[in-house]
Amino acid sequence: MRPSPSLASHARTCSSPPSSGSRITATRTAFRISLDKLGLDYLDLWLVHQPFNDYYGSWRAMEELVDAGLVRAIGVSNFYPDRYYDLVCHNRVVPAVNQLRLNPYDQRRDTREISARYGTVLQAWSPLGQGGAVLKDPVLVSIAREHGKSVPQVILRWLVQTGVSVVVKSVHEDRLRENIDIFDFALTHAQIDAINALDRRETGNGGPDHRDPAMLDFLRTFE
């Protein structure tokens, strides 16, 4: 038995042959390579990186890996509500996780609603807005001052307290410790409402919009 912590990885959906059969085979091969490199006998979580190319073929191969006990859970990343719902409707296993950009300025309420309906956990990447204007927002600064915490801690607490898992990147030990130190306080309902009101619906999110034909043409250059 492997001890904690749990390990997750992404299954890329670029750089692959176009047919479903080829995609299923390519996914199986990619999984074995990842497992060998990690020196493990199973993964806790494996994600489809983006809704592009034959991600249905990838998903069905991943379902087989779950059945075989080689992956404990499978999920998706960067899936908008329409792509997420389509995947749920036409496949056997519901994604355990949908990992996407989510922060006070980009709250993805439509995705949160449909994910909750099917029991998929939302996991926020870039929850601190990549250190941008959100960290200087006066509402967040005021709430942080009330609790004697930093703005990043308030944002992370808001996400966790409202049921969102978080992925926070840092190479500094002091910041890593700060990011973990969010369980000794709780936001009030009024404070949560104030943060919810900051949503700017910035769904362009600084990453690929897989509904944009121009972006899909760009992604094809990596195949």
Located regions from the model:
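Solvent-exposed, non-membrane alpha-helical residues enriched in polar/charged side chains
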Residues: 1, 5, 32-35, 63, ...
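N-terminal binding-site loop/beta-alpha segment at the start of enzyme catalytic domains
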Residues: 1-14, 130, 221-223
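Short secondary-structure boundary/capping segments
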Residues: 6-8, 37, 112-114
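Active-site acidic short loop of glycosyltransferases
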Residues: 11, 40-41, 92-93
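A short, structured active-site edge motif that brings together acidic residues
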Residues: 12-24, 44-51, 78, 102
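Short, acidic/polar
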Residues: 24-39, 57, 84, 107
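Beta/alpha (TIM)-barrel catalytic core signal, keyed to glycine-rich beta->alpha loops juxtaposed to Asp/Glu
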Residues: 50-223
